[in-house]
Amino acid sequence: MRLNDNNNNHSWDAKTYDKVSSNVQLDWGRKLLDKRKWTGNEIVMDAGAGSGNLTKILADRVPYGQIFAVDADPNMVQQARSNLSGWRNVQVIHSSMDKANLPIELDVIFSNAALHWILNQEDLFSHFGQLLKPNGELLIEYGGHGNVERALMVIFKLMQSDQFKEHFVNWKQSWYFPKPDEITKLLEKARFRDIQVNLSERTTTFSDREEFAMFVKTVIMKPFLGYLPNAKKKEQFLDAFLKKIVQSGWALSLDYMRLGIFARK
């Protein structure tokens, strides 16, 4: 398997992400959308919309409404504009969700598997409050406390090994997997009400080694592979990870923990 030889730590491989996330994260997103009764005319921000595959499903729920599909990654924005070109009620915006400047107030802020990339969530929820209409809603799920803990444990050990440690001297953690009580306090501080925050386990098993490897490489290892100098080194890092998983006798699975949020302004 050839790995993308792109050293940009902050840019996603949008086309590959489209393929590998369709079964896992798209299914979670559908179920999250099902938790709300949609009237069809809501004004919505899809915060961290990525390549826009889930935005299509959201657009069908609000055929008379308006969706702002917001993402900070230029590759994802380009892919989203391609994927969503036929949806007249969707506008794709290149912006970080915590700085998005929208022309009208929102009925709903929807987000699936994205908020954990924002480290300052106090400012994030304060900004969300400013974007919403009175009685506007948050409908959100993302990585919570303990998320993919087993995979990260293996990755951290590899980072400290003689083979790879020189490349991670300046590595910085780029995600935040919070506990429910931490987010409840932030929502209260941002003056939200009817707050519901929960943490649920979503262990995800893959059908074969190739599917597992591609998902891990594209999604889980994104904050790490950019620190490695070339494609060969990235391949070695992924292969070492897979070898550790097999040696440990673990199934080809990821122990996802999902933090769910509903709140009203």
PLM features per residue range, with description:
Residues N23-G40:
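Conserved alpha-helix/loop element of class I SAM-dependent methyltransferases that forms part
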Residues M1-K15:
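N-terminal, positively charged/glycine-rich alpha-helical extensions of SAM-dependent methyltransferases
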Residues V108-Q121:
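A short SAM/SAH-binding and catalytic strip from SAM-dependent methyltransferases
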Residues E122, E137-S207:
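Conserved catalytic/acceptor-binding region of the Class I
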Residues M45, S51-K99:
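Class I SAM-dependent methyltransferase SAM/SAH-binding core
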Residues Q196-G249:
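C-terminal helical/coil "lid" or tail adjacent to the Rossmann-like core of SAM-dependent
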Residues N101-I109:
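A short acidic, Gly/Pro-enriched loop at the edge of an enzyme's catalytic core
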Residues I118-L119, L132-P134:
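Helix-to-beta-strand junctions that scaffold the AdoMet/dcAdoMet cofactor pocket
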